[in-house]
Every structure is written in C-alpha cells, then in structure tokens.
Regions:
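Glycine-centered coil/turn sites that cap beta-strands in beta-rich domains
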Residues: 1-38, 60-65, 79
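Short, surface-exposed loop/turn motifs with a glycine/proline- and acidic-biased composition
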Residues: 50-83
Length: 92
C-alpha cells in the first residue's frame, strides 16, 4: 500500500505551549511493538498513551493536562531500538 508511511515519525505538539489540551501526530511504517508516552523533565512517566503491538499508519493523539502541573514535558515514541522525542510546555 503506497499510503503507508516509510519511516517512524513524531510531530511537535500543537498548540505549544498548551492548556488544557494539545495534539500531535505520529507515523508507524510497519507492525511494531510501540510505546507512546509523556514524561516530565525528570524522566518520570506522566501518561502512557499506548503500549503494545501497533498497526502501521498515521495517527493523531489528543493529550489532556488533567493531573499535570505547569512545566516542560517530553512526548516519547519508542519502537524497538528507535526512540523519538518532542518537548512540550504546559502553562496553567
């Protein structure tokens, strides 16, 4: 299928800074074991968005800032040895 992405990709979130919600997109080129999560700047897990076997394609995610304090966070996409990150800022 020519519509499938050919590489892993994690976009920046929008809007950034955000309050109360933000969204981003990501691409998975093949069936993969994937972990998609938000971490605080100290490396603590804040929200696990997805963990498990993931089908290929392009996907959009909305993140709600419930139970999150103002500050910097990292969106992290892990697939095998690959790790992609994007920084985002919550302003309450």
């Amino acid at each position: 299928n020519n519509n499938l992405p050919n590489q892993f990709y994690l976009s920046e979130n929008y809007p950034n800074p955000f309050n109360p919600t933000t969204q981003f997109s990501y691409q998975i080129p093949e069936f993969s074991d994937v972990e998609l999560a938000v971490y605080d700047i100290q490396g603590n897990l804040v929200k696990m968005i997805f963990k498990g076997s993931h089908k290929p394609g392009e996907f959009k995610v909305m993140v709600n800032s419930d139970n999150m304090a103002s500050g910097y966070y990292m969106t992290v996409l892990k697939a095998g040895d690959l790790i992609l990150t994007q920084k985002m800022m919550l302003l309450k």
